[in-house]
């Protein structure tokens, strides 16, 4: 092989190696920042189409309705623990150590982002509450299906205080 061909071959091999290195670093960075959405049922039983369950320590987002009567607040700190359920009957306990959104309440649709712990709880770093009675994150709406019912108000409630 003459020297000119050797140079071209080395250049092509170097370019391919560089592209492979950049692609692998990019995939690694995306993998560490990727948050997959799960419903409480999918955490327990795996995704319906693949059966894949989230791993302990994996960053995930969980969406569903806050179970009425499940909220436990620590009186000495901001720590709060509550259950989130979905239409499939699944339930996951969420722990959170910060201020909850103003719109947060039991029976409310929420999305919590955090890390799955060994005991099956979600240690949330962020909790998002829906904006009004008409809004629901698309993932939660799909997961909840037809079981999400709009609140019904009486005529007295609709009129407000006069």
UniProtKB/Swiss-Prot annotation:
Annotated InterPro entries: CcmE, CcmE-like_sf, NA-bd_OB-fold
Locations listed in the record: Cell inner membrane
Keywords: Cell inner membrane, Cell membrane, Cytochrome c-type biogenesis, Heme, Iron, Membrane, Metal-binding, Signal-anchor, Transmembrane, Transmembrane helix
The keyword Transferase is annotated on this UniProt entry: no
Side of membrane Periplasmic, spans: 30-162
GO CC annotation, single: plasma membrane
Protein's job: Heme chaperone required for the biogenesis of c-type cytochromes. Transiently binds heme delivered by CcmC and transfers the heme to apo-cytochromes in a process facilitated by CcmF and CcmH.
HAMAP family: CcmE
Protein name (database record): Cytochrome c-type biogenesis protein CcmE
Organism of derivation: Shewanella amazonensis (strain ATCC BAA-1098 / SB2B)
């Amino acid at each position: 092989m003459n020297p000119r061909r050797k140079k071209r071959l080395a250049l092509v091999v170097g370019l391919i190696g560089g592209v492979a290195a950049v692609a692998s670093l990019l995939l690694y960075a995306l993998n560490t920042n990727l948050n997959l959405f799960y419903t409480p049922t999918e955490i327990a039983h795996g995704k319906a189409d693949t059966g894949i369950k989230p791993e302990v320590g994996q960053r995930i987002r969980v969406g569903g309705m806050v179970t009425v009567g499940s909220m436990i607040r620590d009186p000495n700190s901001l720590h709060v623990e509550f259950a989130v359920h979905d239409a499939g009957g699944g339930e996951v306990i969420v722990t959170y150590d910060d201020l909850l959104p103003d719109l947060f309440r039991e029976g409310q649709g929420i999305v919590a982002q955090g890390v799955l712990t060994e005991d099956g709880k979600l240690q949330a770093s962020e909790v998002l509450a829906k904006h009004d009675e008409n809004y629901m994150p698309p993932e939660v709406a799909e997961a909840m299906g037809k079981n999400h019912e709009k609140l019904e108000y009486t005529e007295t409630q609709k009129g407000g205080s006069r």
